[in-house]
Curated annotation (Swiss-Prot):
Source species of the chain: Klebsiella pneumoniae (strain 342)
Gene3D superfamilies, alphabetized: UbiA prenyltransferase (1.20.120.1780)
Protein name: 4-hydroxybenzoate octaprenyltransferase
Pathway the protein contributes to: Cofactor biosynthesis; ubiquinone biosynthesis
Membrane topology: Multi-pass membrane protein
Top EC class for this record: transferase
Known EC number: 2.5.1.39
Name of encoding gene: ubiA
A single MF term (Gene Ontology): 4-hydroxybenzoate polyprenyltransferase activity
Catalytic activities: all-trans-octaprenyl diphosphate + 4-hydroxybenzoate = 4-hydroxy-3-(all-trans-octaprenyl)benzoate + diphosphate
CDD domains attached to this UniProt entry: PT_UbiA_COQ2 (cd13959)
Transmembrane segments: 33-53, 99-119, 163-183, 213-233, 234-254, 268-288
Length: 288
């Protein structure tokens, strides 16, 4: 019986960290890989690559824990989130806090193997991960903070490889923020009605009937900024083809969200994994 209870607890931690739902980690991973490949260029040091890949999964898990901790009193009122480990009682608040600390410490131990500049930048990464979940109570733009949190691995990657933060770094960082606002607005469109009832703020609520138009403008801006990154770094035709494919994927997402149906909005959000993958493949092939 004790083993069974222990197994149930581990499964609850597994759900709390969303290790069963890798989409968030992948949306964090792709910009990290973009930055490592551009900063290297094309040949990131193996240890630095390993540190960042592991760090992505650890910090995404930590972000999920603190997000659910911040939303623990709201999630029980939303059908999609009512069975999450904290509102359901499968994980206690103390256990969630402990798990968050363990995940952050493991991430920091990895960062300590990198240079001083990257270690200092990691402090901002922790601050963004902690602050983001609470922003949806105070501002309709929490997705901007999410974009900064998901994109902070970009300056960290440039710092770890070259100890510099060139213009390409900041253009890519801005592109990632705009991309995150676009895809997380699609995600927020799924819960918009519930969020209005319980007082949670989001860009989906802020944009209202202009949501599809603004998402489209953001997507065009992402492509333009990533095109500028390619131009600054002399990337080849492979990369520009990947931008063309990404534009097609964005077009497909616009079709999915056209009627604002919950399931299709979620499919549009999930489709962004392919955008990140396609851009990475274009970058990688351009450096071959």
């Amino acid at each position: 019986m004790e083993w069974s209870l222990s197994q149930n607890k581990l499964l609850a931690f597994h759900r709390l960290m969303r290790t069963d739902k890798p989409i968030g980690a992948l949306l964090l991973l792709w910009p990290t890989l973009w930055a490592l490949w551009v900063a290297s260029p094309g040949v990131p040091p193996l240890w630095i690559l390993a540190v960042f890949v592991a760090g992505v999964w650890l910090m995404r898990a930590a972000g999920c824990v603190v997000n659910d901790y911040a939303d623990r009193k709201f999630d029980g009122h939303v059908k999609r989130t009512a069975r999450r480990p904290l509102p359901s009682g499968d994980v206690t608040e103390k256990e969630a806090r402990t798990l968050f600390i363990v995940l952050v410490l493991l991430s920091f131990l990895l960062v300590l193997t990198l240079n001083t500049m990257t270690i200092l930048l990691s402090v901002a990464a922790l601050a963004l991960a902690w602050v983001y979940p609470f922003m949806k109570r105070y501002t309709h733009l929490p997705q901007v903070v999410l974009g900064a949190a998901f994109g902070w691995s970009i300056p960290m990657a440039f710092s770890a490889v070259s100890e510099s933060l060139p213009l390409s770094c900041w253009l890519m960082f801005l592109a990632n923020i705009l991309w995150a606002v676009a895809y997380d607005t699609q995600y927020a469109m799924v819960d918009r009605d519930d969020d209005v009832k319980i007082g949670i703020k989001s860009t989906a609520i802020l944009f209202g009937e202009n949501d599809r138009l603004i998402i489209g403008i953001l997507q065009v801006a992402v492509l333009a900024l990533m095109g500028a990154v390619g131009w600054l770094n002399g990337l080849g035709w492979e990369y520009y083809w990947s931008l063309f494919v990404a534009a097609g994927l964005f077009g497909w997402q616009q079709k999915l969200i056209f009627n604002r149906e919950r399931d299709n909005c979620f499919k549009a959000f999930m489709n962004n994994n392919y955008v990140g993958l396609v851009l990475f493949l274009g970058l990688a092939m351009s450096y071959l």
